[in-house]
């Protein structure tokens, strides 16, 4: 059997955009203090979350309306536009006024598997973290009922992928993609700013 001419053509890819904000260091300390103040005065959101001890402002405080976060908000939106352009997504259908909230992880906090539907594009920006902060995991959206035995994993057959957060790192993904956050093991705080971009009607 001649396999020399076999080519593997990639279709239906799962795209995760990754970039680091070059201006992050000028923003981290000020906005970390702001997030800690918000935790003291704003009720935690995330109704019906299993991980209900993880502080978040989903539905209780909108970061997209806070001018203190405007630099990061603008950075995220600009990168989401690049992400869409790379896939020839019609920008006229992208609502560039996102729903944005913060999640603050202390030791033993986590986030269960979830997706961000009915949003269209989602993003996670890491405001405060270190090299041992909890990782984020993404699950392969294709559920194979009878998976083959895999000898070694690569970007063609991963069942899930993980990212180690770094300060200023931004991840962009389609909102249907399931993801979770491992349990925070260290005593430092991990602050993630999350964004949901909806489709315009």
Question: Which residues make up each language-model segment?
Answer:
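Short proline/glycine-enriched turn/loop segments at secondary-structure junctions
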Residues: 7, 112, 182-186
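Non-heme Fe(II)/2-oxoglutarate
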Residues: 1-90, 110
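Catalytic core of Fe(II)/2-oxoglutarate
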Residues: 152-201
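A short coil-to-beta-strand element that immediately follows conserved catalytic motifs
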Residues: 89-100
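Hydrophobic residues positioned within well-ordered beta-strands of beta-sheet architectures
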Residues: 17, 98-100, 121-123, 191-195
């Amino acid at each position: 059997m001649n396999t020399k001419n076999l080519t593997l053509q990639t279709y239906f890819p799962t795209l995760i955009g990754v970039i680091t904000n070059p201006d992050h260091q000028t923003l981290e300390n000020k906005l970390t203090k702001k997030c800690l103040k918000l935790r003291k005065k704003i009720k935690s959101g995330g109704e019906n979350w299993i991980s209900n001890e993880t502080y978040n402002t989903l539905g209780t405080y909108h970061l997209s309306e806070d001018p203190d976060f405007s630099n990061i908000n603008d950075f995220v939106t600009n990168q989401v536009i690049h992400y869409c352009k790379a896939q020839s997504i019609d920008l006229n259908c992208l609502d560039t006024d996102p729903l944005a909230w913060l999640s603050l992880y202390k030791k033993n906090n986590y986030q269960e598997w979830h997706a961000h539907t009915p949003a269209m594009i989602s993003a996670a920006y890491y405001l405060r973290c270190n090299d041992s902060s909890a990782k984020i995991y993404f699950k392969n959206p294709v559920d194979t009922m009878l998976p083959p035995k895999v000898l070694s994993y690569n970007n063609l057959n991963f069942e899930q992928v993980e990212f180690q957060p770094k300060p200023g790192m931004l991840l962009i993904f389609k909102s249907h993609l399931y993801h979770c956050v491992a349990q925070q093991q260290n005593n430092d705080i991990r602050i993630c700013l999350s964004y949901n971009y909806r489709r315009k009607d």
